[in-house]
Amino acid sequence: MGGELRLEDALGGVERPYLVSPQRLYTRDDLMQGWHPGADHSATLDGRIYAHVKAHGGRAPDMMEGLAQRTHDHFIDSALAGFLMESARPVIGIMGGSGTLASDPNYRRVVELAASLTQRGYLVVGGGALGIMEAANLGAYLAARSDRERDDAVQALADTPGYASDQAGYLQVAVGVRERFAPGAESLAIPTWVSEGEPINQFAPHIAKYFSNSIREDGLLAVATAGIVFAPGGAGTMQEIFQDAAQNAYKVFGRSPMVFLDRQHYCADTGLYPALQRQAERLGFADLLSVADEPADILKRFPVRPSGLDATDTPRRVLMRMRNLR
C-alpha cells in the first residue's frame, strides 16, 4: 500500500479510477464493479476508467497521465508474464470483428472452436471485447458444457437487440448467461481502453487490459505462440493478420500457424488469403497458412496437447524478451 501511495504521489497525486501499479491481472468482477441490472457500461469501473481516459486527452494524454498509464501497462505486462508461467498451457489466439453478432454463423463456429481447443489443453486468448472476441471467451467458458448448452447460450445472446442498440439490455443478458453456466473454464482476454465505449465481454476470467493499443496488440499476437485463428473482421483484424505475418516472416518470436476461418470471406470477398499466401511462399512460411470453413478442419492444425509438453515458459519468455522484463 505504501509503495502504491508513493507512486501515485510521484505521478502528480491525482485521484484516478485505476491503480497505477496493479499487482495482478484484472478479473471480470473487478471491471464490472458498480454495475447493476438495468445499468449500461458507463456504470462499471471499466466504463469509468474509459471516461477518465477520454477526459484526460484520450490517445494524447498530458505528461503525468501518460506516465501513469504507461506505468500501469508495465505492471500489467509483469502480471501477464506471471499468469502465463502459472497457466502452463500453450496459447492460441482467436481474432475477428468486434461487430459480429451472436446470430452470425461464424460466431457459433468460434464458440465451438474455442471450446474444443480448451478441451485439448490450450489456453484461448482474444481481444476481450464483443463479437468474435466474445465468442472466443464464451466458447472457452463453456468448454465443459454440452453442445446443446452452448447452443442455448449463443441463442440467448442472439435474441437480444445487440450491444450497439441496447447496452443495458445486452449486458443484462450476457451477465445472465455467465451466471447460468458458472463456473466456466479459463481463458485470457487482452483488451484496451482505446476504443470508445467498448466493454469487456463477460466470459474471460483473466483480463490484461492496457491503455496503449500498440503495446496491447504486439503482446496479444506475441503470446499466441501455438498459433492464431482469424475469423472475418474489419480493418483491425486485417492489421493483426499482417502484423502476425511480419512476425512469422522475420521469426521475431519463432513461427506459428495462421489459420483463416471462412474461405468465401478470405479467398473470394477480400482476396486476403491468396495475397498473403503469395508473400508467405516468397518469405518461407507458406506451410503455416491454411483456410477452412468448419471448426473440425481447423482443429486438424492444433492436435491434442502431447503429454508432458512444457508450454509454460514459451509465451512468458516471448513477452519478457519483448518487453525487456526481468
Question: Where on the chain are the PLM-derived regions?
Answer:
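Short acidic, glycine/serine/threonine-rich loops at helix termini
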Residues: 136-139, 200, 240-243, 270-273
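Glycine-rich beta-alpha loop segments
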Residues: 1-172
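Acidic/glycine-enriched connector segments
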Residues: 131-230
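Short beta-strand segments
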Residues: 93-97, 127, 189-192, 231-232, ...
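Short, acidic/small-residue loops that bind anionic groups at enzyme active sites
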Residues: 121, 148-159, 231-232, 238, ...
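C-terminal functional extensions of proteins
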Residues: 220-222, 255-326
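Glycine/threonine-rich flexible loop motifs
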Residues: 103-105, 238-242
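Short, charged/polar "capping" segments at the starts of alpha-helices
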Residues: 5-8, 102, 197, 265-271
